[in-house]
Amino acid sequence: MKTIFVFLTLAVLVSSFFKKLFLRASNIMIKSISEGKSQFSGPALSPNIDPADEHIGHSPEDMKIIFCQQCAFHCIEKKKNIAHCENSICRCTLEDIL
């Protein structure tokens, strides 16, 4: 009879401990989720920045560099060296990379 009483008492204590622990963890998660939503709800524009300046495109030199980088990656995937990258034409060598 004593063992049943002790077992039930321990079961109640353990279950109440886990219930408090679960509630605390869920409150922390809810708080962090709500903070996360408020952080990413929309970026506030600075008064010193003109919104028209935010979406400036790439210059032609930047576009050539980006194209040549993509060309180099393409050649490397084929296990070839890059022969040349001019006027939006990508050429890889015939020899394999050693």
From Swiss-Prot:
Range of residues in the leader sequence: 1-16
Subcellular location: Secreted
Predominant place of localization: secreted
GO BP field: defense response to fungus; killing of cells of another organism
GO cellular component: extracellular region
Cystine crosslinks: C68-C85, C71-C90, C75-C92
Keywords: Antimicrobial, Disulfide bond, Fungicide, Plant defense, Secreted, Signal
Domain of life: Eukaryota
Family that this chain belongs to: Belongs to the DEFL family.
Protein name, as recorded: Defensin-like protein 219
Protein species of origin: Arabidopsis thaliana (Mouse-ear cress)
